[in-house]
Amino acid sequence: MKIRIEQTSVEENEVILRCAQLDDEMLRVLSLLRSGMQKLLVWNEHREMLPLSVSKVVYCETVEEKTFVYTHDGIYQTALSLAELEDRWGDLGLFRAGKSSVVNLHEIQKLKNCGSGRIEALLTTGEKMVISRHYAPILRERLGL
């Protein structure tokens, strides 16, 4: 597959896929493009509803049946469950880290084995998150470790 990027002075970004046939690889590319355009609806501490780009998510956690979304800019709440977040945006890097947390793989700076099969992840915010022993092998496989 060839990839060509052209920078122009158009007002709106445009992606054109040229293919001999729409095979599984091209369908996956198309799916990634579409999911990347979707916004996660969150609300802030003032109860204002905001669209949030998934790429801004550092991690998410569930506390007392409420799902919180952590970014570099603040903490938000969403009506989606962790399973829904992972299902919708797993291809964009949202990965289940434990029973009550999802981490954006693109926001991990360093990984460290911490015994009992768990992995400690240092995030770009300086926070540490533990990947449970249940999800650690899946993470290793996904990252090719």
Regions found by a protein language model. Name each.
Residues 141-145:
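Short hydrophobic/aromatic patches at helix-to-coil boundaries
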Residues 27-124, 128-130:
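Conserved binding/recognition cores within well-folded domains
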